[in-house]
Amino acid sequence: LVRCSFSNRSIESLIHMHYSFGIDFDPDYQRGSVWNDTDRAKLLDSIFAGRSIGKFVLRRVPYDESLTKNCLYEVVDGKQRLLTLTAFYENRFVYHGYTYNDLPQEDKNWLKSAMTSVLELPESTTEKEVLEVFIAINQNGKPVDDAIIEHAKELLQEEKKNG
């Protein structure tokens, strides 16, 4: 059993972890970058609406491994979201006509101060345990099927009509 630590962090703090300590986005078990600009915009829409963007799972990299990887963390869950946040922060994509630098200061402050949950796997976590966590996160549960999503969209349209 892996003893994990939970913390709530601001988006700014999460981005700071990447720039200050390094986060490996590409451990062997991770898929590549698969989100498009629509997916990225939906994430930022959620942040600006004050909705949860889910938790991030990071593994503290063992010291000897950190020397070769040149980073202190690896992303176990939340890669697409974290790539989106760093890409936007670096002005590498446009969100509703704005790069990060073009955002009004009030919106920058909102984005940076938005809170999210981070689960940190300790340095002592073995590769086997990391893989078990990754599989459990990505395999467990039952996704909502398309019919339920369509029904919710129909209900939303009806609500919009009724004002």
Annotate each predicted stretch with a short phrase:
Residues 1-13, 19, 23-37, 41-163:
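Basic- and aromatic-enriched surface patches that contact anionic nucleotides/nucleic acids
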